[in-house]
Regions:
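Re-entrant/interfacial helical elements at transmembrane boundaries that shape
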Residues: 102-104, 138-151, 179-190, 388-401, ...
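Core transmembrane alpha-helical segments of multi-pass membrane transporters/permeases
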Residues: 53-100, 285-351
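Long, contiguous bundles of hydrophobic transmembrane helices that form the permeation core
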Residues: 3-14, 18, 31-38, 42, ...
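Alpha-helical transmembrane segments of multi-pass membrane proteins
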Residues: 116-130, 155-175, 197-206, 366-380, ...
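Membrane-interfacial loop-to-helix junctions in multi-pass transporters
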Residues: 3-7, 73-80, 108-122, 155-161, ...
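N-terminal alpha-helical transmembrane segments of multi-pass membrane transport
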Residues: 1-87, 91-110, 114-117, 219-244, ...
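Hydrophobic alpha-helical transmembrane segments of multi-pass integral membrane proteins
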Residues: 82-85, 112-147, 335-337, 360-400, ...
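Short helix-coil transition sites and intra-membrane helix breaks within transmembrane domains
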Residues: 26, 76-80, 90-101, 131-143, ...
Length: 471
């Protein structure tokens, strides 16, 4: 294929997708459409569709559509199914009130802390812990605004300080239940150097050793930045804010003790299984799918005991399957991104990039690729407010580009994935910033001013640590 046509087509497609991301438009259909167009261009130019072991339908006109079907099948058999299960389990936890109880129980200890600025790092770390239960940044912010915000105000914390801390709670807590972690782990496992890699191994072996120190650094940065910014703020009583109590929070101690563990039970099972295997006591691999299914069965049993009715408990399980359906857009985005990448591979762009990047590591420039992708993530996130859209779109490309640059795919995957989640709280158009600023009656830019330094400090520290560990 002519180089001018190849690069021109690729640049135009990237520009269209970038425009749609910035405009916060749904890019799934665009990725599908552009991917198919690129495959047709490749076929006209005499290239083949770049899918391993792809068998043509016998009609070139149908092959790009067959590629979509093939990609859907392979994704649903792997990462897609895990994401659907996680969506179902999260929805079921909300339905039976377990999420509400977990938030209530974990929030209680902070009521005894009276210093507003000591509360800043405590609430930040607590909020990130709660993101294991409620991974959506906007949903977690809504819950914390209703439950923790009044407590923080009564402790003397200003609205902007409290809002900034709440806006930054769902960031980079390492969890095998994160759909972004599931997607990249399954993609890496397709390559020989990461053969057999599970989500737990990726999260605890790579993600956590960067994300946990980064969270601690951000907690410290939060303390000093909020204290610096709040030096001229008046302490105002929060009598106007009413605390809302969850409808499930007045039940027995036994009930609360059991339900508080249910939302994080899959994580507990995966952590236990991971360390048992690490210590050599077992060779059993507990997958995310099995952990979720076991947890779901236990949750149904607990709910039937609480309701004194198996019939009523089983009726509520319908929410699990509806939750799976609600998670389908994430799977569709992953498939759409893969189809687009197949299109880029088919026109020869990926091979051309590999040739350009070969030798980069030998010249001591191995950090350039991760840096470019982190900067690109920053631009897209700041303009669009989406922390993971670009990452999902890039997942199929990460191993290939890293190999071409002569560096580990982990050195690309970890910083790019973490950067998007961190910088979400710095975008004035992100859902979480809009929700928080509206709730505390402040301008989004004022909230972003309070979140920016801790998040940027986290990105810089995270990138440097990733390069030291993985490059």
């Amino acid at each position: 294929m002519n180089s001018f046509v190849m690069y021109g087509t690729a640049i135009l497609s990237i520009a269209i997708i970038g425009y749609m991301l910035v405009k916060k438009m749904d890019i799934k259909i665009t990725l599908f459409f552009i991917g198919v167009i690129l495959m047709y261009i490749a076929i006209v130019a005499g290239n083949t569709i770049a899918i391993k072991d792809f068998k043509s339908s016998g009609a070139g006109l149908l092959d790009p559509l067959l590629a979509i079907v093939s990609t859907f099948k392979s994704t649903l058999a792997g990462a897609g199914f895990i994401i659907l299960l996680l969506g179902g389990y999260a929805a079921y936890m909300s339905e039976i009130g377990a999420n509400e109880i977990t938030v209530s129980v974990l929030s209680k200890p902070i009521k005894n802390i009276r210093s507003p600025y000591v509360l800043v790092p405590v609430v930040f770390l607590l909020g990130n812990l709660l993101s294991l239960v409620i991974p959506s940044a906007s949903n977690l912010a809504i819950i914390l605004l209703a439950t923790l915000y009044p407590v923080l105000r009564k402790a003397g914390m200003s609205p902007l300080t409290a809002g900034a801390v709440i806006a930054t709670t769902a960031t980079i807590m390492p969890t095998p239940l994160g759909s972004d972690n599931v997607a990249i782990a399954n993609e890496l496992a397709k390559y020989p150097e990461f053969a057999g890699l599970t989500v737990s191994q990726y999260v605890f072996g790579y993600h956590a050793i960067v994300s946990i120190p980064t969270l601690l650094i951000m907690a410290i940065a939060h303390y000093f930045w909020q204290k610096f910014e709040g030096r001229n703020e008046a302490i105002i009583s929060a009598n106007e804010v009413e605390k809302t109590e969850g409808s499930y929070c007045s039940n027995s101690v036994l009930y609360r003790s059991a339900y508080v563990l249910l939302p994080i039970l899959p994580i507990i099972l995966l952590v236990i299984a991971y360390f048992i295997k690490l210590l050599g006591y077992s060779k059993v691999d507990l997958t995310v799918e099995i952990a979720v299914v076991i947890s779901f069965i236990i949750a149904v049993l607990c709910d039937s005991i609480k309701r004194h009715s198996l019939k009523e408990a089983v009726k509520e399980t319908e929410k699990f399957f509806k939750g799976m359906g609600n998670a389908m857009p994430i799977v569709a985005l992953l498939v759409a991104a893969t189809v687009y990448v197949v299109g880029l591979k088919s026109i020869g762009l990926i091979s051309a990039l590999q040739n350009v990047m070969t030798g980069m590591n030998g010249n001591g420039l191995g950090f350039v690729l991760p840096l470019i992708l982190v900067v690109l993530s920053a631009v897209i996130v700041l303009l669009s407010g989406s922390g993971t859209a670009l990452f999902f779109a890039m997942v199929p490309l990460i191993p290939t580009l890293a190999s071409a640059a002569g560096i580990s795919a982990i050195a690309v995957a970890v910083p790019m994935g973490l950067a998007g989640n961190l910088l979400r709280a710095v975008s004035p158009v992100s859902a979480v910033i809009i929700i928080v600023s509206g709730s505390i009656k402040a301008d989004p830019i004022e909230v972003v001013k309070r979140t920016s330094i801790p998040m940027i400090a986290g990105v810089v520290f995270m990138f440097i640590l990733s390069m030291i560990l993985f490059l």
